[in-house]
């Protein structure tokens, strides 16, 4: 089971509208979602209980128990979850967790669904409403799944912990584990939304668009879930998106030092208290790290020369040269050191 990547911002609300209509047709029999208000009370209790139990195991750092209660495919490749439990145990231990109303997803059919889309709750003429949600999961085997989201508050940064659960016999077994901070560089989604709007008002659309993207990431506990709030932010981000940035799979060229750089991605990245901007570009070979460093540095300077507004919004710039094989070489320069 893979979690789907996000749709392009401009597409989301449009496909929601026709997907609502499509739900009335044959595909509704393949993918059905029940929100907490719609599901049987015993099912809701079971999902909430499983979420609390797995959170307690996570707080104790009991990866062995979590693995024991996982579905076979997850247990067979458990290293990622084990690492996530270890990384977040200190934040979970002694913290208070509140379970949000869960969701029940039913996928029917004889084989895995290449792209399963679940519409949960009530939708209006314009798409999502206050209590609705959409989940998009790739390669999902037929079965009953629960989504239990916990808000975790302790001495550290607020977090969410999301469990995807699969009904197996009398158990709701672990099928996915997603721990996520509710803040980036010490700020929550509301802070990034306000600053994005401020940048937009100053016609700094590159900063606005990148801050909207961070706000969207912080507004949903998992990337394969969207809500009315994230849909509205996608619309705002689309309105601010500049034409000269790589987005939606489209590369953009930037000239620096007589070389043409094919930029493939640009995105914000929080590292500790710093908030950086990362730019990736195509490279034939990164084995010569001295040359790669020089080219990364030249690109960083050219990027700031073209978009000086980035200095107002970020603590540093990361350039990553990426080979066709996926191997890359990155360089981070603090903003104050870039002349």
What do the PLM-derived regions correspond to, one by one?
Residues 30-60, 176-191:
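Short, low-complexity N-terminal intrinsically disordered segments enriched in polar/charged residues
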Residues 144-187, 267-291, 298-338:
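Short beta-strand edge/turn micro-motifs at domain boundaries
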Residues 79, 85-156, 186, 244-287:
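Surface-exposed, charged secondary-structure patches
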Residues 5-19:
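Bacterial N-terminal signal peptides that target proteins for export
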Residues 33-42, 48-49, 64-131, 216-246, ...:
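Short solvent-exposed beta->alpha transition segments
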């Amino acid at each position: 089971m893979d979690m789907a990547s996000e749709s392009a911002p401009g597409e989301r609300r449009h496909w929601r509208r026709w997907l609502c209509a499509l739900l009335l047709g044959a595909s509704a029999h393949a993918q059905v979602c029940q929100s907490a208000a719609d599901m049987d009370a015993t099912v809701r209790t079971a999902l909430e209980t499983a979420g609390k139990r797995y959170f307690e195991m996570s707080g104790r750092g009991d990866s062995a128990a979590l693995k024991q209660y996982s579905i076979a495919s997850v247990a067979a490749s458990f290293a990622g979850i084990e690492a996530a439990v270890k990384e977040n145990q200190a934040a979970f231990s002694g913290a208070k967790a509140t379970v949000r109303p869960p969701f029940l997803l039913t996928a029917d059919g004889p084989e895995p669904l290449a792209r399963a889309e679940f519409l949960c709750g009530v939708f209006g003429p314009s798409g999502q409403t206050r209590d609705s949600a959409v989940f998009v999961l790739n390669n999902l085997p037929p079965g009953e799944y629960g989504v239990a989201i916990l808000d975790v508050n302790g001495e550290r940064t607020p977090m969410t912990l999301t469990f995807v659960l699969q009904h197996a016999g009398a158990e709701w077994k672990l099928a996915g584990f997603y721990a996520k901070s509710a803040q980036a560089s010490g700020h929550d989604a509301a802070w990034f939304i306000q600053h994005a709007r401020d940048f937009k008002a100053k016609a700094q659309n590159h900063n606005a668009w990148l801050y909207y993207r961070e706000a969207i990431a912080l507004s949903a506990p998992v990337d394969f879930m969207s809500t009315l709030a994230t849909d509205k932010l996608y619309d705002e981000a689309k309105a601010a998106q500049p034409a000269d940035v790589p987005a939606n799979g489209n590369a953009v060229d930037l000239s620096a030092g007589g070389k043409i750089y094919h930029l493939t991605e640009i995105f914000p990245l929080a590292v500790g208290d710093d908030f950086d901007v990362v730019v990736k570009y195509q490279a034939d070979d990164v084995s010569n790290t001295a040359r790669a460093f020089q080219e990364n540095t030249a690109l960083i300077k050219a990027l700031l020369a073209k978009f000086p507004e980035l200095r107002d919004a970020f603590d540093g710039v990361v350039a990553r040269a990426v080979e066709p094989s996926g191997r890359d070489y990155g360089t981070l320069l603090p903003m104050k050191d870039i002349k």
